[in-house]
Amino acid sequence: MIEQFYDLKPEVLALDRQALALCREQFAHVEGIRDYNQLKMLRAFTDSGVAAQHFFGSTGYGVWDDSRNKLEEVFCRCVGAEAALVRPQFMSGTHTLTVALFGLLRTGDTLLAATGRPYDTLEGVIGIGEAGKGCGTLREYGIRYDEVPLKEDFTPDYAGIAAKAKTATVVHIQRSRGYTQRNAFDLDTIRKVAQTVREVNPNAVIFVDNCYGEFTQTKEPLSAGADIIAGSFIKNPGGGITPTGGYIAGRKDLVEKISHRFTAPGIGADLGCTQDSLRDTFLGLYYAPGVVCEAVKTAIYAQCLLELCGVHPVPRYTEDHNDIVTCFDSGSVAALQGFCAGIQKNSPVDSFVSPEPADEPGYTDKVIMASGSFTEGSTIEISCDGPLRPPYTCYLQGGVNFTAGRAAVINAVQNAFFA
């Protein structure tokens, strides 16, 4: 059917048919995860007693916003948290993580990155090198930073973690890959890092950046030893519907502590109006398990198709998936730009736009991005990006439905490797 809508070369169509056949077993596996998570989501809604009245938000201060409180109750049930902040005021994943870090850390405390250097945009938050200099970084507030690089095989250095965690206040784990070519960490790895830390420092706070990982498995990192998780609602948990916002969830005492940085000291979680955002946030969250499944299926298909083209993606399509991201070395500026152009041209919004490399806040290299999304910056909708530095690695994520995701991917592959 796809050839009725797109001018695809015979050799590309043959690879498409082969990829679909090879992916059947993996598709069935992630559909099983979807079904479990959707039933868990349904029970979260029914057990919390969500009513139509909860779709109406508040204005002004947002004091006594029962609808906001109900949303946070539902989210807690979904991720196994004691408490949560689910708020439209969080502008991005980086902003959400920043609020959490500044809420947890005080002058003289130490932040330890246990899984290597964090994502590029967090370098400015922490104050690594010249990033964020003069902007009020953690380091400028007297908070120490240390990190444990990953081993050569991209696995955690548990001995290094044990040595450095003894004096750490907060231990940061980044579940997804950032701009590195490693697999997302599974829950067993997160659990082992947490156990390693607690053996030498029981009081350390285990903080997991959960961006891109929500609902890819049947459990979340709070069940694997994390104390706090954080992420963005324009990624997985928003289901491609929620237009903005983020979440911080976990231990009640820690969420309370963070809430005073989210608003102001002495005010905490009681303030924060929701205006007209609640219906879309409830709806996006409800649909998230199914949408995440479609994104993972798009990733599996892309990985298989790329392998058939002689490209080596991470992860492989046969591996377990713990985020929605696929990365691969395109090998050249032309291939990277060609793949991004193919994704952009076959996206529902701004399909006529040609992606061009540009400077982006928080990044040291020019970055090329393709995103024809309904929500600006959404990465649960299909998008791809990559820094313009050798080996010109491309990062593909999202796809709110597999049919459209497949169309974008196959056209991008043809554009990059069969031009």
Task: Give the ranges of each region predicted by the language model.
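Conserved PLP-enzyme active-site core in the AAT-like
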Residues: 2-24, 31, 41-47, 51-54, ...
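Active-site-flanking structural segment that lines cofactor/substrate pockets
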Residues: 55-85
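Structural motif
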Residues: 82-86, 109-112, 169-170, 204-206, ...
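Conserved residues at beta->alpha junctions
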Residues: 88, 249, 330
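Conserved C-terminal alpha-helix-loop-beta "cap" of PLP-dependent enzymes
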Residues: 307-419
